[in-house]
């Protein structure tokens, strides 16, 4: 955010702070107005279905199968003023004229945007699509994990089906890839890894998925967990091994990291550690993770998620830490939980630290909220960062699209020739408005193929 003028009598106050003060003076009516920014959008996001004349239309491919070619006519990349034709050949955006007889999709002036990447989600825990779950009070990780186990046994739908349902919904809302954290503990054995792995195979035409074996119950404090993590990595069922709060929860920093980094080193998998620890405790764990990454030459293969010890660091300390993270090739993820816990993405990126955005839990025992919609998560990121300017709203979208792609090692779907033809189509005037209004995803395209229409998967 740009610094406010020191000459202003309100210097140091954000727009939201000033609105809150005005609401307190003006009374309940003003308070309702100030809080309305969090309400569901009432414009494009809830617009009626298009008329028959305004619907996106398709004409079949008549190339004889020599090339999988489609022309998406009348699209406005990123909300450009004038529509263009986007040609896709064999799943890639092409700068050449389309082959004669190519399939034609008339997009009627819709905005085309890159599909997004969910860099941190827990699809195994979800109750998405299930009957309402009444949650019990919980105030510690240990208590939440107990609630996880209760919910796991209470849900009648198999984990595989629940995960696939949620992951398919994510695709229909415009997600092209995700990193799925899956609980591994004696309470579940490897059921979650197997279930999410099955969902990954079922959706491979539409979604790239990395699986993290996540020791939610602790690596050291729960006997049998490290053996399950080892088995998951040895069998090739996972892409990364996880960890959680080595000091604050597992109470064994060195032993915890010995197990996690040892598995990564032996089996050639990456690392993604949940770090909720704050202040000095979190910094001690983070510094130890940096040291292990360097010692084992795992640059580019380690991510730390949440990292609540980073927001609020003094500028000099943040700059030193960011330089060390970049040097070690360690990436970070945030789920934009609140203004005081969201990562300082811009400052980290200035130092070369990749930062991804994720959904976290979706309708699980931890929270009744969540929807696996990364456009909505970009909206939430903009909200907690007090975005106001167009470029600030666009940056929130870029965090959900490009930040996650870089973190997962995927090419950016930037709609330029040579890029993967992964995009979504929505109504709207411009990208900033889309971030605010959250319009219906009328079409989602993966590798040039239409995989979803109006929020529903097609051909699945």
Task: List each model region and its residues.
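N-terminal metal-binding scaffold of metallo-dependent hydrolase/deaminase domains
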Residues: 1-101, 431
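Divalent metal-coordination and catalytic microenvironments
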Residues: 75, 91, 109, 120, ...
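Active-site gating loops and adjacent loop-to-helix segments of metal-dependent hydrolytic enzymes
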Residues: 126-159, 240, 267, 285-303, ...
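Alpha-helical scaffold segments that flank or form the walls of functional sites
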Residues: 129-181, 187-202, 228-234
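Active-site core of metal-dependent hydrolases
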Residues: 206, 212-223, 235-343, 354, ...
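His/Asp/Glu-enriched, well-ordered alpha-helical/loop segment
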Residues: 292-302, 346-428
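C-terminal cap of metal-dependent C-N hydrolases
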Residues: 417-460
């Amino acid at each position: 955010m740009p610094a406010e003028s020191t000459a202003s009598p309100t210097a140091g106050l954000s727009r939201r702070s000033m609105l809150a003060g005005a609401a307190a003076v003006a009374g309940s009516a003003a308070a309702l107005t100030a809080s309305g920014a969090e309400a569901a959008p009432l414009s494009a996001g809830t617009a009626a279905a298009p008329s028959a004349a305004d619907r996106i239309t398709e004409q079949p491919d008549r190339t004889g199968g020599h090339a999988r070619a489609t022309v998406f006519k009348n699209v406005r990349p990123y909300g450009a003023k004038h529509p263009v034709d986007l040609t896709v050949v064999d799943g890639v955006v092409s700068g050449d004229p389309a082959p004669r007889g190519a399939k034609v999709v008339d997009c009627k002036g819709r905005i085309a945007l890159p599909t997004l990447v969910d860099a941190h989600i827990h699809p195994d825990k979800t109750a998405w699509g299930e009957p309402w779950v009444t949650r019990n009070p919980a105030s510690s990780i240990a208590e939440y994990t107990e609630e996880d186990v209760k919910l796991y046994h209470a849900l009648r739908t198999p984990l595989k089906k629940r995960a696939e349902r949620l992951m398919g919904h994510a695709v229909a809302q415009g997600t092209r890839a995700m990193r799925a954290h899956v609980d591994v503990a004696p309470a579940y054995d490897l059921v979650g890894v197997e279930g999410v792995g099955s969902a990954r195979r079922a959706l491979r035409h539409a979604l790239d998925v990395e699986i993290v074996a996540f020791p939610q119950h602790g690596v050291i404090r729960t006997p049998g967990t490290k053996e399950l993590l080892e088995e998951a990595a040895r069998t090739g069922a996972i892409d990364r091994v996880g960890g959680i709060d080595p000091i604050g929860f597992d109470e064994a920093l060195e032993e915890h990291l010995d197990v996690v980094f040892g598995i990564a080193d032996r089996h050639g998998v990456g690392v993604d550690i949940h770090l909720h620890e704050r202040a000095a405790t979190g910094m001690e764990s983070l510094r130890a993770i940096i040291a292990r990454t360097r010692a084992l030459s795992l640059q580019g293969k380690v991510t730390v998620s949440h990292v609540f010890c980073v927001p609020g660091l003094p500028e000099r300390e943040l700059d030193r830490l960011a330089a060390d993270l970049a040097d070690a090739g360690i990436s970070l993820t945030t789920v934009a939980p609140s203004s005081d816990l969201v990562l300082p993405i811009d400052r980290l990126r200035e130092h070369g630290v990749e930062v991804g955005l994720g959904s976290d839990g979706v309708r699980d025992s931890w929270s009744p909220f969540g929807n696996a919609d990364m456009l909505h998560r970009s909206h939430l990121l903009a909200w907690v960062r007090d975005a106001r300017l167009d470029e600030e709203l666009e940056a929130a979208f870029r965090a959900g699209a490009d930040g996650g792609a870089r973190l997962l090692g995927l090419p950016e779907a930037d709609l330029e020739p040579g890029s993967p033809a992964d995009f979504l189509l929505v109504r709207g005037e411009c990208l900033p408005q889309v971030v605010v209004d959250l319009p219906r995803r009328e079409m989602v395209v993966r590798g040039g193929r239409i995989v979803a229409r109006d929020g529903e998967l097609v051909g699945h």
